[in-house]
Design a protein with these regions (language model features):
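Phosphate-binding glycine-rich loops and adjacent basic patches that engage nucleotide phosphates
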Residues: 11-20, 44-45, 61-65
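Short, low-complexity N-terminal intrinsically disordered segments enriched in polar/charged residues
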Residues: 1-29, 33
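Conserved beta-to-alpha transition
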Residues: 40-42
């Protein structure tokens, strides 16, 4: 736990630690039962079962390390910028920048997450 951040922000930092550790059960517990997750290239994932399916079967990343470079807290929301370095399921190595936006429910669980990647698109 980091004393510089709120419990919600520490929960976001825990999220990246759990993802990097491959702790899918721990990841899912951070989300509200009806949470929605949106990221480029996929239809939104709604609910814990859909999130678990994504992390177990659909996520193109095999493993890696997230480094959070900045974290900004708002009212019931947390924004993060960071870098990811890892390996895709194909064996390809990747290194990219990302931004995540988490909406936090009154109970502390994530009600929504939106992910964006810094990649040439236009």
């Amino acid at each position: 736990m980091n004393d510089r951040h709120s419990p919600a922000a520490n929960r976001v930092l825990d999220y990246y630690r759990l993802v990097d550790a491959g702790d899918i059960a721990g990841i899912i517990e951070l989300f509200a039962p009806d949470a929605e997750y949106s990221r480029p290239g996929y239809d939104p994932f709604v609910g814990r079962a859909a999130l678990e399916t994504f992390y177990r079967n659909q996520r193109t990343i095999r493993g890696g390390k997230h480094t959070v470079r900045s974290l900004v807290e708002g009212v019931d929301a947390i924004a993060v910028q960071g870098e990811f370095t890892g390996t895709l399921r194909t064996g390809e190595r990747v290194s990219l920048r990302f931004a995540d936006f988490f909406d936090v429910a009154p109970d502390g669980n994530f009600s929504r997450r939106n992910t964006y990647f810094y990649q040439p698109m236009v």
